[in-house]
Amino acid sequence: LCNFASMLENQYQYELREAGCDEAGRGCLAGPVFAAAGILPPHFHDPLLNDSKQMTERNRDKLRAVIEREAVAWAVEAVSAARIDEINILNASFEGMSLAAARLDPAPEFLAIDGNRFRTRLEIPYRCIVKGDGKYADIAAASVLAKTHRDEYMLRLAEEFPQYGRIKNKGYPTREHRLAIREYGLTPHHRLTFNHAIDQLEFPFWNKKSRP
C-alpha cells in the first residue's frame, strides 16, 4: 500500500509559525460544523497521518490522541445548526476556523487553510490550499481533530435521537437519514436551510421559531 504520510510536507511555509485549519461536517443535514486549528512541532511525523476522510475511524482516533499530546497548540470550535442557518454553511466554516485559530497559544503567524476560499477578521496572513489536508501535515492534523470531535458529538446526539440513525450517518445525507426525516420530521439539531427531502413529498417539520 502507498504510504500517504511520506508524501505530506510538515507545513506550507517555514518562515512563520503556521497553523493548519480545516473543518468537518459541512455537507451534513444535522449537527454543528466543527473546525480545528493546530500548530505542529518541527519535523512532526506519524505514518498514519493523512486526510481524515482517507483514514479508518480507528486510525483517526489513534491520531487524535497523538496530535493532542504532541501539538504545540490545538483548538476545536463548533458552529451550531442555528448559526449555520443564520449565516450559511460557508461563512459558518470560516467562522469556526477563525475562532479555533484565535484560541491558539502561542498565536499563529500564518494560517494554512484547506479549501479554495476563506474570510476572516483575524489579522493573520493565510493561504487557501485545495486538498491541503492531503498535502500538509498541519492541515491533515486539523482535519483529524475536526472529524473526531464532531463524530464524538454526533454519537452523543444519536443517543438522544436514535430513530435518525446518527450512529451510522453522523448527520450526513444518507437515504436512511432522509427517510427518518420524512417519517419523524426535523429536530432542533437539523439545519433548516438545507434540503432534507428524499423526493418531492412534503414532510412535517418543527417551526423555525421554536428552535431553542
Provide a role label for each language-model segment:
Residues 2-212:
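RNase H-like, Mg2+-dependent phosphodiesterase core
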